[in-house]
């Protein structure tokens, strides 16, 4: 039985509408994030692969189904799947996953992997917006990720290398049942130079940025923490500037969702926020994030991006200002902006959105943890 059964009535309603709109009999998902969206479980054995070891499907006549091989079937049935899913197993030596699905699915059908004769499905629109059950799971997930990254931030020392800190982060996440496709650690030498500070064998030194993207049950969380031992004199001002851009992005996201605007409209507000905090061109140095949910980012905003901004939905904006970064996963609804990656064990800073974006939005966001060397 899947430990995190998804809201299957909602999934069925969305998939019925998709089949009707596209004149199909079935749709299949073998990519891990969409498999997790539909089942609440995992089809991953090889973390480097973009396709899992099973495909979850919805059949107009037969309902929820899973196709896998004889190696994986017993484990998936016992540990990863709700009982409502019917399972079929092909001999491991006989067929590829694509061939096994093709042999068992009614047609016409669609899939998120290449299957001869099947249409292609982009599941991102099906995964949005979030349901109440998704949101409840997200709150627990966000708290667990925050606890993991903060436990490491509270224990590192200046002589730790970036790779040692990254190893500690992965361990803290794994013990909480979380898989982390992204773990970044940038010390005082490299964090000001690079936006993606992939860990190296260098000491973190005077301060460090710790950034992770982790997932469980299909849902993804991204967040960053800053820990300082002998902080550069510019760090506090740059961190506050990044936080203010993030809060402005969240305010603009809520406005866009209410108005039916798109990602490009939010990006314009982000550009305005950077200008307001004195870093007008800084947005050109790094992507700013976007919608989270059942992917690290369902979409990443750009100046001309036309993705519709929806609510309720999780968003992870990640503005940077030359060695400082503010990032968290936040639930945006019609009437609330709720940070998900928070605990009571880290210092916070209350910051308002810039006036050109919103004059009445103020949020508490993670601040810099100052520690003795």
Where are these regions (language model features)?
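Active-site neighborhoods and metal-handling regions in enzymes and metal-associated proteins
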Residues: 1-373
């Amino acid at each position: 039985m899947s430990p995190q059964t998804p809201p299957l009535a909602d999934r069925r309603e969305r998939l019925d509408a998709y089949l009707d709109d596209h004149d199909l009999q079935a749709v299949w998902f073998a990519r891990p994030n969409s498999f997790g969206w539909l089942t609440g479980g995992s089809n991953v054995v090889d973390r480097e692969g973009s396709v899992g070891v099973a495909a979850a499907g919805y059949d107009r006549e037969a309902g929820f189904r899973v196709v896998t091989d004889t190696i994986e079937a017993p484990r998936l049935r016992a540990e990863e799947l709700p009982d409502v899913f019917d399972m079929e197993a092909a001999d491991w030596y006989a067929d590829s996953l694509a061939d096994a699905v093709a042999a068992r699915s009614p047609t016409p059908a669609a899939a998120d992997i290449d299957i001869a004769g099947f249409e292609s499905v982009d599941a991102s629109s099906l995964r949005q917006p979030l349901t109440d059950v998704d949101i409840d799971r997200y709150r627990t997930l966000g708290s667990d990720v925050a606890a993991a990254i903060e436990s490491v931030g509270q224990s590192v020392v200046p002589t730790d290398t970036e790779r040692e800190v990254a190893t500690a982060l992965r361990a803290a996440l794994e013990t909480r049942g979380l898989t982390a496709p992204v773990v970044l650690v940038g010390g005082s030498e490299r964090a000001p130079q690079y936006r993606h500070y992939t860990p190296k064998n260098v000491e973190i030194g005077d301060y460090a940025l710790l950034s992770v993207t982790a997932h469980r049950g299909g849902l993804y969380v991204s967040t960053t923490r800053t820990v300082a031992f002998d902080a550069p004199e510019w760090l506090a001002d740059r961190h506050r500037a990044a936080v203010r851009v993030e809060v402005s992005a969240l305010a603009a996201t809520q406005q866009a969702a209410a108005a039916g605007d798109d990602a490009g409209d939010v990006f314009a507000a982000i550009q305005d926020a950077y200008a307001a905090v004195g870093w007008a061109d800084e947005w050109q140095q790094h992507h700013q994030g976007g919608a989270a949910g059942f992917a690290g980012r369902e979409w990443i905003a750009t100046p001309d991006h036309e993705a519709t901004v929806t609510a309720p939905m999780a968003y992870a904006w990640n503005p940077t200002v030359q060695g400082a970064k503010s990032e968290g996963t936040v639930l945006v609804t019609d009437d609330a902006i709720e940070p998900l990656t928070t605990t009571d064990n880290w210092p916070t800073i209350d910051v308002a959105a810039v006036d050109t974006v919103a004059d009445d939005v103020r949020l508490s966001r993670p601040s810099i943890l100052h520690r003795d060397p």
